[in-house]
Amino acid sequence: MPTRVCCCCSALRPRYKRLVDNIFPEDPKDGLVKTDMEKLTFYAVSAPEKLDRIGSYLAERLSRDVVRHRSGYVLIAMEALDQLLMACHSQSIKPFVESFLHMVAKLLESGEPKLQVLGTNSFVKFANIEEDTPSYHRRYDFFVSRFSAMCHSCHSDPEIRTEIRIAGIRGIQGVVRKTVNDELRATIWEPQHMDKIVPSLLFNMQKIEEVDSRIGPPSSPSATDKEENPAVLAENCFRELLGRATFGNMNNAVRPVFAHLDHHKLWDPNEFAVHCFKIIMYSIQAQYSHHVIQEILGHLDARKKDAPRVRAGIIQVLLEAVAIAAKGSIGPTVLEVFNTLLKHLRLSVEFEANDLQGGSVGSVNLNTSSKDNDEKIVQNAIIQTIGFFGSNLPDYQRSEIMMFIMGKVPVFGTSTHTLDISQLGDLGTRRIQIMLLRSLLMVTSGYKAKTIVTALPGSFLDPLLSPSLMEDYELRQLVLEVMHNLMDRHDNRAKLRGIRIIPDVADLKIKREKICRQDTSFMKKNGQQLYRHIYLGCKEEDNVQKNYELLYTSLALITIELANEEVVIDLIRLAIALQDSAIINEDNLPMFHRCGIMALVAAYLNFVSQMIAVPAFCQHVSKVIEIRTMEAPYFLPEHIFRDKCMLPKSLEKHEKDLYFLTNKIAESLGGSGYSVERLSVPYVPQVTDEDRLSRRKSIVDTVSIQVDILSNNVPSDDVVSNTEEITFEALKKAIDTSGMEEQEKEKRRLVIEKFQKAPFEEIAAQCESKANLLHDRLAQILELTIRPPPSPSGTLTITSGHAQYQSVPVYEMKFPDLCVY
């Protein structure tokens, strides 16, 4: 009887329920009943309105089987669901999806790894189905949380743990594919979801034993790697996620990366951080690269007080990002990048200076030394980043960056620099000067300007050649190297490397062009400034061999790039003045430096004589070099800059044949049409306002001795020494007149300098004002001479603006006593 009741009840059940029940066999090991499954599928396709009921009933059975741990029937139910999903059309599948997702959620909530993997696989199949019209009410918050948790599985069995993590990654990939394509349903990009998805992927990527070092887009991994290696699968999912990011949600995808790297302390060492940001930069669209750079800069600002190695790690990541972004769109962040980097460069120097001042003795010194080295790592990373970024900019932007960096360099006596150096002190200021010039050197590398005026405008050249940047030999080296980068427009510097006597300059195959009008104008305006810098740079006591090599290269590059006949004469005057300064030695230079200057002059005159190809000049230079080779090899660069070179005790006893003589050079050049009148006038460097303010020795005092005893130290054929009787009256007169002579010289120099550099309008206005003043003075004088003298016979009164005389009677007049009889 009970059997007949059950049969009767089953016959009264709805058809979709009977079809669903029939697909389950009595023994779950037999698997899905295929014939009944085909009937159920046909029914669902024929009556799509029944799909939601079919799904609800399947979900009910699956929930019951999950609770009762009947895994066999759970597998059959999910297999049936998958087949129904694949068979039904996309338009009719929507009512069925809610039941399907509910069943997947039940499986993911279960504690059995097998069921979790089963639910994930079903969800991935669902994610690959394209829907014509998405359902905006459908949310995937639960799946994001659950799949992210599976990515961090800590199961005791390694194989099961790997399987669960792979399932979690594949689930996240499915969520991404299902949601990110629809811009109207962008909830997946919200921070609360990205804060779960991105760290989960990075956690699995971090498990790679050897971090992938490829720098370009990766080759497609094999199917086996995708299925078995969580790290490879996570990396591909991460790339896919970033590739789908748009302008509005880029930052939400990148910021969790910083949080993960901070939390796990992955900036030092930073191999994984670099790897992550390479993936980011290659995966996102090129026009969004500057967003990532901005985020890195912002994070660097936020971590500015962290350990030096952490900051260095962030800066190296920035370098890698800039290296990739510079190839495409760099966005409007150029000045922001440099401004932030220079700010952190100043902070690093300040930290270094504070550590040096705070360290005292013992272990503190060791700790201070370690921090000092770490700060140098930070500084080198910043300079490398600045240089790489700057070298990839177009020329018009690079010139702006050059001016920007130069404006940051602290220069004595000016307040134009924009870096705060109040806390640095002298040592810190010198350090920041070196760091900024090194940055400038990196930016100017490879810069090619059509005219030298474009490369070295006055606003850039004046602070670059400031005496404040001559206090240290390393500063002078950097200044000269920056000038070489900007002057060398034909790549000749490599051919001039190393100071030496070149037997045949033609073998160097120097490239040069005709000097243009703009370059000629530049030398007329700024030539004396360049000569002065070279002249003073040669006379510094802390010069090393590299300084002399760079000074020689500077003279050679000016000759190649900027020299016409007038400039050649000026350069020869400069060389002779350097020779005279080494002989006179008014600065009390060591013998090595004096011989180094003599060697520098010899190398340059040998070069310039062959460049202008005047036979008599070449012959004189060659003769002096030949005599030096035999009698005074320490006057040649090949010997003086060699280790253990024998130095003379003095230079006063040397014969004139060892020196380059002005009259000989003038005679040889005059015969070839050169205007040599100025060769007889000794070179005198300009005196700047900064020289008066700075601590450097007065150039006027330096030059005065040179002019007076020049002829006595460099003997020539037509110079006769005269003796003068020295008396007390002569000495008294010389003392009284020396101050006035110096004042007159200074006045003349200022007048000449003003007429050379001041604009025409300014000179005309000043002359006009002087003419007006003179006219007023003349009018006053004429008025006094024409006006009659006051008479005792009357007095002058002024009424209503008119002068009137009032007469005095004779008896009231007052005469002098001598006039009265």
From Swiss-Prot:
One of its GO terms (cellular component) is presynapse. The keyword Cell membrane applies. Coiled coil: none annotated. It comes from the Eukaryota. Keywords: Autism, Autism spectrum disorder, Cell membrane, Cytoplasm, Lipoprotein, Membrane, Palmitate, Phosphoprotein. The modification Phosphoserine is found at residues 360, 363, 422, 694. GO terms for biological process: phosphatidylinositol phosphate biosynthetic process; protein localization to plasma membrane; synaptic vesicle priming. It is a lipid-anchor. Palmitoylated at its N-terminus, anchoring the protein to the plasma membrane. It is found in: Cell membrane; Cytoplasm, Cytosol. Component of a complex required to localize phosphatidylinositol 4-kinase (PI4K) to the plasma membrane. The complex acts as a regulator of phosphatidylinositol 4-phosphate (PtdIns(4)P) synthesis. In the complex, EFR3A probably acts as the membrane-anchoring component. Also involved in responsiveness to G-protein-coupled receptors; it is however unclear whether this role is direct or indirect. Component of a phosphatidylinositol 4-kinase (PI4K) complex, composed of PI4KA, EFR3 (EFR3A or EFR3B), TTC7 (TTC7A or TTC7B) and HYCC (HYCC1 or HYCC2). It is linked to Genetic variations in EFR3A may be associated with susceptibility to autism. Belongs to the EFR3 family. This is Protein EFR3 homolog A. It comes from Homo sapiens (Human). The lineage of its organism: Eukaryota, Metazoa, Chordata, Craniata, Vertebrata.
